[in-house]
Each structure stands twice: as C-alpha cells, then as structure tokens.
Design a protein with these regions (language model features):
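Structured lumen-facing ectodomains of secretory-pathway proteins
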Residues: 49-183
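Extracellular zinc-dependent metalloprotease catalytic-domain scaffold
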Residues: 1-55, 181-183
Length: 183
C-alpha cells in the first residue's frame, strides 16, 4: 500500500482517488483524535475532536507563579483543594513513593521526568496524597498532561507548574490552593 492519500498520485505508484477526509472539530468526542487507514485506493479518515480548555488555577501565600498552571487530561475535571505541599520521595514519582506518612492528606510535589504523568499521580494517590503538583523540567510554560496508561485509575487532581516555581513551593509549610473547572 502506497498510503499516499491523494486524488492523483502523479504516476508515483499506488491507487489514486483516495484523498484524505479530515474532520476538524468533530463533536462526537472530546480531548482526542483518531484516524482510520483503509487499504490503498480507499480514502482514509481523520477525526480531530474538540479539546476542552479547562480553567486551572493555583495560589499560595507568598508564591507568584511564573506561568499559569496547566491541567491534566485525567482525574477530576472540577476541583477545589487546599492542602500543604510535600515533596514526594523519590522526587520523580515513577515508582512507589517512600514517604507516604508525610504525604497523607497533602499535595505531593513531583518532578517531571521519564515516566508518564498518570503513573506519577497514581503513585502519589496510593501514598495518600490528595492532589499533585508536577514541576516542569524545562524553563518554559507548563504543558497539559495526557492521561497515559493509568489515567482512568486516578481519582485526585493534578496540575503542572513552571520549573522556576519549584523553590517557592518547596520552602516548607507552603499551603496551596488548586482549583479546576471543566467549564
């Protein structure tokens, strides 16, 4: 199969007449996209769903955030949570956390790293955390976090903040308010 998805292949092989059908802002779903790729000669179809731009906010006394926080595409969409921030151990959150006694009822601060976001948040949830702040690992704006393999198992909210915000959040005794809205 040539997989060229166009009406005229200009003599370069494959069957013609299979122009791609791209459906932008398809309202049959949200926060996703898919593509069907039939055999050569039949038109492929791409559906790009509407992405929900939820509002995510964070505030803490004495903390000025570099960028607005970003939300997660998993866990609760609407939340309003206030708790003390505690650094997770290990800080990348990729394995079971070892400081569950300190995290119980708190917001876990986890560094962005090599494993998927939902694995980090699930590990914090299993350690007793009520929310998660993931700190970006590059000096740029936080990015929305995809659900990954464990997204459907996560029941606590998560946000991402800028790398520059880490020192203020790890100063000790910081009480953070995290808010999310699905509107």
């Amino acid at each position: 199969a040539a997989g060229n998805a166009q009406v005229d292949n200009f003599g370069r092989g494959g069957l013609g007449g299979d122009a791609m059908r791209a459906e932008a802002l398809d309202y049959s779903g949200t926060n996703n996209a898919n593509m069907s790729t039939p055999a050569d000669g039949a038109p492929p179809r791409m559906q790009m769903y509407r992405f929900v731009n939820r509002g995510v906010y964070a505030s803490a006394p004495g903390v000025t955030f570099t960028y607005p926080p970003a939300g997660a595409q998993f866990g609760p969409l609407a939340f309003d949570l206030t708790a003390e921030v505690v650094v997770a151990e290990p800080t990348d959150g990729c394995v079971a956390l070892t400081n569950s006694a300190s995290l119980s009822g708190k917001i876990a601060l986890i560094d962005r790293g090599t494993c998927e976001f939902s694995a980090k948040v699930l590990n914090a949830q299993q350690a007793g955390a009520v929310g998660v702040v993931i700190v970006n690992n590059v000096a740029s704006a936080p990015a929305a976090m995809a659900a990954g393999m464990f997204g459907s198992s996560v029941a606590i909210p998560a946000i991402m903040v800028a790398q520059a915000d880490r020192p203020a959040l790890t100063a000790g005794g910081v009480v953070l308010r995290m808010q999310g809205s699905n509107a």
